[in-house]
Regions:
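A short, low-complexity linker immediately N-terminal to eukaryotic Hanks-type protein kinase catalytic domains
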Residues: 2-11
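Conserved structural core of kinase catalytic domains
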Residues: 58-61, 70-73, 77-120
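Catalytic-loop signature of eukaryotic-like protein kinases
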Residues: 140-147
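C-lobe/activation-segment region of protein kinase-like
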Residues: 133, 137, 149-231
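Protein kinase-like catalytic core scaffold
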Residues: 34, 79, 93, 154-155
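Conserved hydrophobic core/spine positions of the Hanks-type protein kinase catalytic domain
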Residues: 123-130
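Conserved hydrophobic "DFG−1" position in protein kinase catalytic cores
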Residues: 26, 38, 85, 95-97, ...
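ATP-binding glycine-rich loop module of kinase domains
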Residues: 10-70
């Protein structure tokens, strides 16, 4: 059956329709059973606010997504959505889903994560434990990076990942991947942690910074629990 796709946005109270992702173009089919990541600079979707416009960088993000989510699929298939197709030629990934993402469900129902998925903490912690076991550092942790399928939290957005053998990077070099709101939150936290934005920083430190930053989206005590995995 041929699926008809449309742009997928997050409908955020007080802001309206917002891009679901700053890097790729998010697409969803009409009955919300298939989600597509299209790694292309679609100006209609991003409306001139594109974060990644360099084709080489877009290609790098695409290859990271395919690499790391495939690792997860191979070792921990229950923790990522079923991959329907990897279209290497057109840089599209198709996933089996059941409705809108985890974050959007809370927005649509004006409720908490606990209301949507009572054991979400345990499930998300299992995902981070899998990352740790595979030597993956994942910095795209926003709650829109998860779908729920048959009561199981499924993780996506592996374009901003590195592994235990990756060379340190400077935060300045990846600022185009990070929203302005997130950047405003990150700088004081980098200062508090003694991280120089222009200096190569080990990935274990960046992972700690990511968990610290996403306390704006998740309970602080839960992020602190996740940080312990990378100590």
């Amino acid at each position: 059956m041929e699926h008809i796709f449309e742009y997928y946005y997050n409908n955020v109270p007080g802001k309206g329709l917002c891009r679901n992702n700053l890097i790729y173009t998010s697409l969803i089919n009409k009955d919300k059973t298939v989600f597509c990541q299209h790694y292309v600079n679609d100006t209609d979707y991003h409306k001139g606010q594109n974060q990644v416009v360099d084709p080489a960088l877009m290609d790098e993000k695409w290859l990271r997504e395919v690499n790391y989510i495939t690792q997860m699929r191979n070792k921990y298939p229950e923790l990522v959505p079923t991959i329907i197709k990897i279209d290497l030629e057109n840089r599209k990934l198709f996933f089996k889903i059941q409705g809108v993402d985890f974050w959007q469900q809370t927005l649509d129902n004006n409720c908490t994560y606990d209301d949507i998925l009572p054991n979400w903490r345990e499930q998300m912690l299992d995902i981070f434990k899998a990352h740790k076991a595979l030597g993956i550092y994942k910095y795209s942790l926003h709650p829109s990076s998860y779908f729920i399928v048959d009561g199981q939290l499924k993780s996506i957005n592996y374009f901003f990942c590195y592994n235990s053998t990756s060379a340190p990077i400077s935060l300045r070099s990846v600022m185009s991947h990070i929203s302005e709101d997130r950047q405003a939150d990150l700088f004081p936290k980098m200062l508090a942690l003694g991280i120089d934005v222009d200096a190569p920083t080990p990935h274990d430190q960046i992972q700690q910074l990511a968990f610290e930053s996403f306390k704006t989206n998740f309970p602080a005590d839960f992020m602190d629990e996740c940080k312990k995995l990378y100590v």
